[in-house]
């Protein structure tokens, strides 16, 4: 009987170890592929148009963030650096275990259509606290001409009258 219990224990331990390895591998998996939007088939002209990248070159900015957010990742149209305009915003709520850095290509896609996109590395955005902190961070960027002793390219260029929020999986709950 002891031998059977020992064997069952070893089998359970092996299963748990394999599941742990599988979860680690999944969390390290590559994200959305760069050309994801070219592989989607659609029957509509409007969908086809907006599946393609927009006309604007995209730039990237990041800044360290507190707690589990790790960093604020901001994708924006490069013209923002030289133009005196305001730009609409998309705030991202990540799904469970999914960091913003795994979805770069979709954020670059949105920015190519002239949106500022902000996300974090938070992996549990069910309560939208990360989204709230993104808005606070954008307000800081919008209201300060100089940040960390450098000219701030986002100064007075964020359109807070046109802010959208997106999320997938658990991040969808944060959107609500």
Segments and roles (model prediction):
Residues 29-85:
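N-terminal cap/lid segment of alpha/beta-hydrolase-fold proteins
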Residues 16-28:
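Hydrophobic alpha-helical membrane-insertion segments, chiefly the h-region
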Residues 1-17:
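N-terminal Sec-pathway targeting helices
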Residues 73, 88, 105, 112, ...:
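Extracytoplasmic/secreted proteins, especially bacterial periplasmic and envelope-associated proteins
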Residues 84-95:
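Short beta-strand element of the alpha/beta-hydrolase
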Residues 81-85, 129-173:
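Gly/Ser-rich "nucleophile elbow"/oxyanion-hole loop immediately N-terminal to the catalytic nucleophile
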Residues 80, 95-99, 117, 122-127, ...:
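Solvent-exposed loop/turn segments at secondary-structure junctions
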Residues 101-120:
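Short amphipathic alpha-helix adjacent to the substrate-entry channel of hydrolases
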């Amino acid at each position: 009987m002891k031998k059977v219990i020992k064997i069952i224990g070893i089998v359970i331990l092996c299963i748990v170890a394999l599941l742990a390895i599988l979860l680690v591998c999944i969390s390290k998996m590559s994200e959305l592929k760069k050309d994801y939007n070219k592989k989607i088939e659609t029957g509509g002209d409007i969908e086809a148009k907006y599946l393609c990248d927009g006309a604007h070159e995209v730039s990237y900015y990041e800044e360290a963030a507190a707690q589990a957010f790790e960093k604020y990742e901001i994708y924006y149209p490069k013209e923002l650096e030289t133009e005196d305009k305001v730009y609409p915003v998309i705030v991202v709520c990540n799904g469970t275990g999914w960091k913003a850095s795994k979805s770069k290509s979709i954020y670059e896609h949105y920015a190519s259509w002239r949106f500022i996109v902000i996300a974090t590395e938070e992996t549990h955005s069910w309560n939208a606290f990360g989204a709230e902190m993104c808005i606070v961070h954008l307000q800081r960027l919008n209201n300060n001409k100089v940040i960390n002793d450098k000219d701030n390219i986002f100064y007075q260029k964020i359109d807070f009258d046109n802010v959208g929020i997106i999320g997938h999986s658990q991040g969808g709950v944060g959107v609500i």
